[in-house]
Regions:
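Alpha/beta-hydrolase active-site loop
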Residues: 81-103
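N-terminal cap/lid segment of alpha/beta-hydrolase-fold proteins
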Residues: 1-24
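Alpha/beta-hydrolase-fold enzymes
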Residues: 124-211
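Alpha/beta-hydrolase fold nucleophile elbow
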Residues: 104-118
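Active-site glycine-rich loops that stabilize anionic/oxyanionic intermediates
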Residues: 35-40, 118-119, 252-253
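Catalytic active-site module of serine/aspartate enzymes centered on a nucleophile-bearing elbow/loop
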Residues: 271-321
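Conserved alpha/beta-hydrolase
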Residues: 44-75
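Short beta-strand/loop motif that positions the catalytic acidic residue
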Residues: 248-250
Length: 321
């Protein structure tokens, strides 16, 4: 297995995005693109990527705008860009996959999957709507969907905050809209990220990294809420390729997915939109970061076996919706 790092230009036209690829020996059994979550970076998935590469799956991912080593020239962390920059981040996912398919020499018939975690799962769901039929299957980890009324309230509140403080600012409201009362079920709290993982070592490593954590900007939360509104729209969901399989994975104690209830809402919405192959699994005892919990090897294996079982879907990638 070989790991390479390089950069490519974001759709914002100015930011070089850090990209990583984990390359097994050819022929590849499949390929997987990773879309990471809020306040983290793609190398947090190194152990998972090496596991898959050891089984013949090529893995590639990049740091989203304002994350990891993909901070724009103006130096603002956890900021995608001005209003509408959600579009850039979704475009980057599509463009990077096209680039990777060429770089890695992925042959026609080799299935290409997309995995999105947390914020990355919201971006992946936007990608499914905007670029239907371009991946063979999607894995959504730590996803959810706030009720429409709560989302509308959040959008109105963050618009006022942006006008008052500026989109590059941080505020208590923006942080509350990002993380809500996630830590409340886990009182007494050891850290502000107890909701993220039952694995204390994982949280401590996260907190010690200068590339992880931090308060999201008002502008990023504005873009995230806009994206959530898009992916919660029944009309938009009907644009997805209904033949491409989707796997929803979450910890039973993940507050982002409303302890499983929000994940089930997403599953129902997909089925109502006509998706033919939607599966869901909840892991007892696990919180938000199922790929970093103590029993993560079971999650790794489930993802690999699911991809293996859907390898025959490669012919559907260019299929109609």
């Amino acid at each position: 297995m070989t790991r390479n790092e390089f950069t490519f230009l974001s759709a914002d036209g100015k930011t070089e995005l850090r990209a990583v690829e984990w390359i097994p020996e050819k022929p590849f059994r499949a390929a997987l693109q990773i879309s990471h979550g809020l306040g983290e970076h793609v190398l947090r998935y190194d152990e998972f990527a090496e596991y898959l590469a050891g089984r013949g799956v090529a893995v590639f991912g990049h740091d989203h705008l304002g994350h990891g080593l993909s901070v724009p020239p103006d130096g603002v962390r956890l900021w995608f860009g001005p209003k509408g920059s959600w579009n850039w981040v979704v475009q980057d996912i599509y463009a990077f996959r096209r680039l990777s398919e060429t770089r890695l020499g992925i042959k026609p018939g080799t299935p290409v999957f997309l995995l999105g975690h947390s914020l990355g799962s919201f971006l992946a769901r936007s990608h499914l709507i905007r670029y239907p039929g371009t991946v063979d299957g999607t894995i959504l980890s730590g996803t959810g969907q706030p009720p429409a009324a709560l989302l509308a309230f959040g959008q109105a509140a963050i618009a006022e905050e942006s006008a008052r403080l500026g989109e590059k600012s941080v505020s208590r409201l923006a942080t509350a809209l990002a993380f809500g009362s996630y830590n409340r079920p886990f009182r007494p709290n050891r850290t502000m990220y107890d909701w993220m993982s039952a694995n204390e070592e994982n949280i401590d490593v996260f907190l010690s990294s200068p590339l992880c954590g931090g308060a999201p900007t008002v502008g990023l939360i504005r873009e995230m809420l806009s994206g959530l509104r898009e992916i919660g729209s029944p009309e938009r969901l009907r644009r997805m390729n209904r033949y491409a399989p989707i796997l929803l994975l979450s910890g039973e104690a993940d507050p982002v997915g409303d302890m499983g209830k929000g994940v089930a809402r997403v599953e129902r919405a997909f089925r109502k939109a006509g998706m033919r192959d939607v599966s869901m699994a909840l892991y007892p005892g696990m919180r938000h970061e199922i790929l970093n919990e103590r029993d993560r090897s079971a999650v790794y294996a489930d993802i690999f076996h699911w991809m293996e079982s859907r390898r025959g879907c490669a012919g559907r990638r260019r299929g109609g919706s």
